[in-house]
Amino acid sequence: MVATNSVAKRTGNISAGTSAFAMIVLEKELENVHPEIDMVTTPSGELVGMVHTNNCSSDINAWVSIFEEFTNSLGMEISRDKLFTVLFNKALEGDTDCGGLLSYGYFSGENITGVNEGRPLFVRTPGSRFDLANFMRIHLASAFGAMRIGMDILKSENVQIDRLVGHGGIFKTPEAGQRILASAMEAPVTVMDTAGEGGAWGIALLAAYMMDRHGKSLENFLAEDVFGQDQGITITPSAEEIAGYQIFMSRYREGIDIEKTAIHQLQEKGVIENAGTTERRSIPSKS
């Protein structure tokens, strides 16, 4: 919140990395209790509704590693930064509804969707528009799918948001993650030059505030002394992008049972064949 200057009412920040969360500063308490929404506060005590998702970019990272392995096998030395840039920019060429593709980047369970374990999935029909652009776009869109469900809960409580700021690793490549997030939130999303900075920088700003606030509120200190005229770059989604993401979300909600079935049918066990016998063993988690 502090690192993105999102401590005033009707502002919010979205952090997107291995996991993701949206923190919206509320004008009043929510009327109902929602287990999907965590209630916290800003450092100055304003009430915040937090939508937290356990999964975001891990599956994207895994797919980028596959592309990296492929390019290495061709004898090409391409940096991961270059791969991310090329692949994320390719996503911008995809259909707004992701071409009928579906993915769940669930490396772990997801409370908001009622899934208790993770099975990363990529699913398509024979008629889906399967190309690289849609493949990358679906994984970016899916990274914000569970969060969108949580934000819909806040919307049902008539929570008003004037400004959303994104930060975290997924925004290091300009535009792609930001534009798809804006489509998911159905609202403008701003990303600052400090998008890659997070908690450590926010803590440093709080320390500076405690030492040199001159009677100012935290909100005014950040606005006047820290961020000043740095308003970042804002992307507003088009009507077509919003409509496309809504179509994707309908598919995402309906497909949750596929994820649940995969959990039941696909157990994390490996198979070792030894002297004509088959022995099963658990595969250690990489996390």
What role is predicted for each listed range?
Residues M1-S285:
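Active-site core segments that coordinate phosphate-bearing ligands/cofactors
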